[in-house]
Amino acid sequence: MTTATMRAASVPSFGARLDVAEQPVPTPGPGQALVRVLTTGVCHTDLHAVEGDWPVKPSPPFIPGHEGVGLVEAVGEGVTNVAVGDLVGNAWLWSACGHCEHCRTGWETLCEQQQNGGYSVDGSFAEYMLVDAEYAAVVPAGSDPVEVAPVLCAGVTVYKGLKVTGVRPGQWVVISGIGGLGHIAVQYAVAMGMRVAAVDIADDKLALAKKHGAEVTVNALDEDPVEAIQRQTGGSHGVLVTAVHPSAFGQAIGMTRRGGTIVFNGLPPGDFPAPIFDIVLKGLTIRGSIVGTRQDMIEALDFYARGLIHPTVAERQLDDVNEVLDEMRAGKIDGRIVLRLATA
């Protein structure tokens, strides 16, 4: 009997070029579904996975990717909530235990037993992937598989981060870093009724933020971003840091008005200086936020389905994956890159 194969891009060792080659198509186990991948976004987390530069590392060889969109082709034993032909996606939160304190209280993204797509389990840089049927994202019918792919990580991540800031309609939020996450964060913030100030070091990215509804834009190379934000907004009610440079994290404290909340989405290496006196005197809250729960995913995709979110994407092919990662290392990507693997 001939084993079915698929093309996949796998990481043979940390820092190596991805190997695009034939591999066996996986078989869905109990509770799992086999998905024929149409598209997959390329996330900065994928680059960290390839480099192996986070404290918790994947185990090579593995297939990256956690923004995959595709059609269910087969289901394993006990699967009832997705069916053959459904349009679904994988996500960073591939599965969780469902029983711990965090899972029981709606914070499954903090589950210590969670599995992560394209990291601890093989992901979507392949023609086929497995999903846990209980945690797979159900993609709204009629979605553009290319455009919707980044919502599965970048979108849900910034959406949850904005929720955590507690910023209300009519209040100011700073989006620090207008890259793959930040340009989508601007759109969610506007759709949620927030007033947006965007901070970056590239004029073209600030122009993109302006296009998506930012009222204030600040180039941190041309002027002091803390002074500029305080002058133009009176201090932001919240700051969402999606940037990948540690300096942005310290600057966020100075941008925030008294009683405000700073949320970190970006994950650069290293530490940042935190002025204890200012944090205490201003009554600031500093929080981390990682991706989103299944309910957050439903809500984030609903914004897309209603036409409120349009990620800026460029379409490439699986064979381009190493070049795409090189462009990501060099900071040359505007918006998000989405790899096309098949058509519906």
Q: What residues fall within each predicted segment?
A:
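Glycine-rich cofactor phosphate-binding loops and adjacent beta1-alpha1 units
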Residues: T165-P169, I201, A207-T285, A342-A344
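C-terminal hydrophobic helical "lid"/dimerization subdomain
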Residues: M1-M6, D203, G250-G254, R294-A344
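Mid-domain Rossmann-like dinucleotide-binding core that forms the NAD(H)/NADP(H) cofactor-binding site
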Residues: A141-E223, E227-A228
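Glycine-rich beta-strand-centered segment in the early N-terminal region that forms part
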Residues: P26-T40, D53-E101, P140-S143
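Cytochrome P450 core scaffold surrounding the K-helix E-X-X-R motif
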Residues: T45-E51
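NAD(P)H dinucleotide-binding glycine-rich loop of Rossmann-like/cofactor-binding domains
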Residues: S95-S176
